[in-house]
Amino acid sequence: MKQPLIELKNIERYHTNGDTLTTVLKSINLKIYSGEMVAIVGASGSGKSTLMNIIGALDVPNSGEYFIYGRNIADLSGDELAELRCRHFGFVFQRYHLLSHLTAVKNVEVPAIYAMADKILRNQRANALLCQLGLEKQLENKPAQLSGGQQQRVSIARALMNGGDIILADEPTGALDSQSSQDVLKILKDLNRKGHTVILITHDLAIAEHADRVICIQDGKIVSDTANALESMIKPQNKRTFIDDAVIEVCQQHNTEKLNRPNEKNNIDNDNKENNNGYNRNDNSFLNNPKKKLNSSILRSFNSYAESFFMAFNMMMAHKIRTFLTMLGIIIGIIAVVFVIALGEGTKKKVLDEFSSLGNNTIDIFPGKWGDESDNVHTLNMEDLELLYQQPYVQRATPVLLHIAKARYLNKTMRSLINGVSHDFFMLKNYQLVTGRLFDQNDLTLSQPVGVIDKKSAKLLFDMDDPINKIIFIDDIPLSIIGVVESSSLQQNSGKEILIWIPHSTMATRILNQSYIQQISVQLQPNVSPLKSDKAIIDLLTIKHGQKDFYTFSSSRFLQSLNKTTQALTLMISSIAFISLIVGGIGIMNIMLVSVIERTKEIGIRIAVGAKERDIRFQFLIESTMVSLIGGCIGVGCALLFGGLFSLAETSIKIQFTLSSFLIAFLCSSMIGIVFGYFPARNAAKLRPVDALSRE
């Protein structure tokens, strides 16, 4: 006995609203065989559309059994149901349900996208279907540019895209004029004569008379099931596919993916052999074309992802202003994060460079304790300096004696800071000689009245004159300027005070007449630990003095502390800037949630033509991620632009962009797109197709 293509046993469907139970379908028993054209007729509210939704796997019954190709639909997973809709069902809706932002060809291609068909072949097939339906001049028209009859033909072509073994037509002529209605009915009858099973849902008995069987449904029950003898008599016996030979040439070697499990009998193939004289009406061989190398799961998945990106981009372009306003929060947040990090890096680099110019790997030793008045504490002397010179971890050392005095040149008198140092001081502090010479050991030994001045001080004291060999007076003591050095901004005194360096022996004997020194600066060997050396110096001088009557200042330790401080400051400011990214992310989630509501019908259409939950979820996730990433790219570009403008301004701080700031920006924008886009995407994927299609 021939197995029915579709069999419903005791199907019931009801809805609950609080304590109220509304029964829509009652004990439906129905068999539909392959190749039949069946009309289900009923008034509005009779349950005919609910029955169609159950047959088309858009809805599930509350009780009863539904078999298709011999398999109970209750045993199928969500993905298997999607595969069933994708490869075996074709829907023709009363309101066409075309995607408004796609052309006629692209609308027809949608089912094949979810079947992961080759792009070129599916485009060829979509064009051929539309041409066969008389729409060769409207291939690139969007739905708004088509008449009602033309839109319904596009809907029929979409139903046939993956083969359309079973065509479900819900009031296909309800929104058409009489001529267009006759054309659509002729197409459906022609499809049935050539092998497709057609199930026609209508309220009009005149429309139903075109079918082989007329099933009347009233108040959720089948009240009659009669054959149309005339239609059965005129149906030809030799069936061929709807697509002509030109399309068949493109779509050869059918290899339809089987619905049944491998260990079950393939009723689809058997049924095809019985009814098509060796030719399969499910002409979807383009889904598995052996000439193409895209059959591997990896490449086909890649194609699917590429299509998701393309569809997401199309949706963004369809709502340009809304998309831009959505990504504006991300743009501002990325600008803030990148610019703040770059500003922090630039500030840190400037400060570290300035402090590095004071001397690398140095330790300064001061008398007394931190906070003491150094003028009243005299615990350091030249013996301490000589002792430090003997230590293996010390590369060079210099005493420092300080004195504030009036410097006079001709009729110009200025406040000056006099530093008594050794010849090692200039190398230790990274001073660069501009002109003249530095004093040497001979000058130290003979306590020569010579001095070195910095470039800024030379300009203040001598104006444009060459300072070399000029005589100045320090407290009426003559001093010959022998050299000019370049110092960093941290080494320069502010205001009108000038800096002069003289031999420490000259300072001690000619100016101060003292034996003690106010500071010792030590530069360590390159490969020693500053921390251990600092401890060794403290232990050494503590033993010599009998007590710790001094304190040290390590440049390396200070730079480490400064680096940590600037990093913490940058992190704090970046955290504040990151808040704007969070706000932008919330904006994306809000817009995507609204988008899900606005596009509910589109989601229903995509599910009806074969989209799986993961396809819908991935598409919306891609949209939110693309909005975030594009916003991130624009934000980075704006940050670079602002950084360039900032650098052109006369500021002492330079912007320092780093690769890490760009990576952080793109990581943040990607994560925001994924995190804040996930919940709207999940909501979209969880929509029931029958609910989605019913919303306006």
From Swiss-Prot:
It holds the Pfam family ABC_tran. It is found in: Cell inner membrane. Residues 6-244 form the ABC transporter domain. GO terms for biological process: response to antibiotic. Residues 254-287 are annotated as: Disordered. It is an enzyme of class 7 (translocase). Signal peptide: none annotated. CDD domains: ABC_MJ0796_LolCDE_FtsE. The chain crosses the membrane at residues 324-344, 576-596, 626-646, 659-679. Its EC number is 7.6.2.-. Residues 255-274 have a biased composition (Basic and acidic residues). It comes from the Bacteria. GO terms for molecular function: ATP binding; ATP hydrolysis activity; transmembrane transporter activity. Keywords: Antibiotic resistance, ATP-binding, Cell inner membrane, Cell membrane, Membrane, Nucleotide-binding, Translocase, Transmembrane, Transmembrane helix, Transport. ATP binds at residues 42-49. InterPro entries: AAA+_ATPase (IPR003593), ABC3_permease_C (IPR003838), ABC_transporter-like_ATP-bd (IPR003439), ABC_transporter-like_CS (IPR017871), MacB-like_ATP-bd (IPR017911), MacB_PCD (IPR025857), Macrolide_Exporter_MacB (IPR050250), P-loop_NTPase (IPR027417). GO terms for cellular component: plasma membrane. SMART domains: AAA. Residues 275-284 have a biased composition (Low complexity). It is a multi-pass membrane protein. Belongs to the ABC transporter superfamily. Macrolide exporter (TC 3.A.1.122) family. Part of the tripartite efflux system MacAB-TolC. MacB is a non-canonical ABC transporter that contains transmembrane domains (TMD), which form a pore in the inner membrane, and an ATP-binding domain (NBD), which is responsible for energy generation. Confers resistance against macrolides. Homodimer. Part of the tripartite efflux system MacAB-TolC, which is composed of an inner membrane transporter, MacB, a periplasmic membrane fusion protein, MacA, and an outer membrane component, TolC. The complex forms a large protein conduit and can translocate molecules across both the inner and outer membranes. Interacts with MacA. This is Macrolide export ATP-binding/permease protein MacB. The gene is macB.
